[in-house]
């Protein structure tokens, strides 16, 4: 049983900074929140991804309950692309593709509903 459930976006982020570029980095509000909160308590995540998603092991390896991640066959995972200058507090959005997140209807897994 999870002490905390994070519901939100699970995404792939493509980031460009003056220091380099990273393609398809695991991102999204539910991911970032889960990774941080998991340092203090048991966390479950609820979100939706396409069948192109391969980031679930990253969360599971850290003990995060991924049973609430819905995988939509034939769909694509939410993706965001942005650029940062030397002020890393300011992001410029270059592209946003909602993919399956556009139709997201959050559902707790049976285990998470306990």
PLM features per residue range, with description:
Residues 1-5:
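Extreme N-terminal starter segment of soluble prokaryotic enzymes
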Residues 28-38:
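Histidine-anchored nucleotide/phosphate-binding helix
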Residues 8-10:
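Active-site metal-binding loops of divalent metal-dependent hydrolases
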């Amino acid at each position: 049983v999870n002490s905390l459930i994070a519901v939100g976006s699970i995404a792939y982020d493509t980031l460009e900074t003056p220091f380099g570029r990273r393609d398809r980095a695991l991102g999204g509000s539910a991911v970032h929140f889960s990774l941080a909160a998991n340092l203090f308590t048991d966390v479950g995540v609820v979100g939706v991804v396409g069948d192109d998603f391969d980031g679930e092991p990253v969360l599971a390896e850290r003990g995060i309950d991924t049973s609430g991640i819905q995988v939509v066959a034939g769909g694509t995972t939410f993706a965001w692309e942005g650029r940062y200058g030397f002020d890393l507090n300011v992001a410029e959005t270059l592209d946003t593709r909602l993919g399956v997140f556009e139709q997201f209807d959050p559902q707790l897994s049976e285990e998470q509903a306990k």
